[in-house]
Design a protein with these regions (language model features):
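ATP-dependent carboxylate-amine ligase
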Residues: 1-159
Length: 159
């Protein structure tokens, strides 16, 4: 295959839903939907991908499940990784994800419900902002990602 055919083939590849899928966010923001699942290694890769985006960045994180006795350590480490990578804001929801927000420090907020998280995230959305949403399947972070896209299921503006 020639370079032109390879280029055409690569341009036609689409991300699997919930796996670093870039979507148009409300208010001109860019949304990266990585809600399919989460573990420490995939979260580290997602943080790296978000940190490489231009402009301001927000990581929206739900709990990582099934991590065993080191679950708290993994969640706290994720907050430090995001902070050290230069992520601008961290929004979390879930019992363990609160430890992530605590370790991130300034510009992190933890919420008791996904709706409260959505309401806060909507206030941050603006052109040039990239938001990455991630969490284990049990955290149901796809609900958050869907709420932050341009158009809701009924056709209304989401935020």
């Amino acid at each position: 295959a020639g370079q032109s055919e390879i280029r055409t083939g690569l341009e036609s590849v689409k991300a699997q839903p919930g796996r670093l899928q870039v979507r148009a966010g409300a208010r001109g923001a860019c949304l990266i939907d990585d809600t399919y699942n989460a573990n420490p290694a995939s979260l580290k890769a997602a943080i790296r991908a978000l940190a490489n985006r231009p402009g301001r960045t927000v990581l929206v994180l739900g709990d990582m499940a099934e991590l065993g006795p080191r679950a708290e350590d993994f969640h706290a480490a994720a907050g430090r990784q995001a902070r050290d990578a230069g992520i601008d804001h961290l929004l979390t929801c879930g019992m363990l994800a609160g430890l992530t927000a605590e370790a991130f420090g300034k510009n992190a907020c933890h919420f008791d419900s996904s709706q409260a998280l959505i309401d806060s995230a909507c206030q941050l959305l603006s052109p040039g902002l990239t938001v990455l949403v991630k969490g284990s399947r049990s955290a149901q972070m796809e609900v958050v990602a869907d709420a932050l896209i341009c158009v809701s299921h009924d056709g209304a503006i989401a935020c």
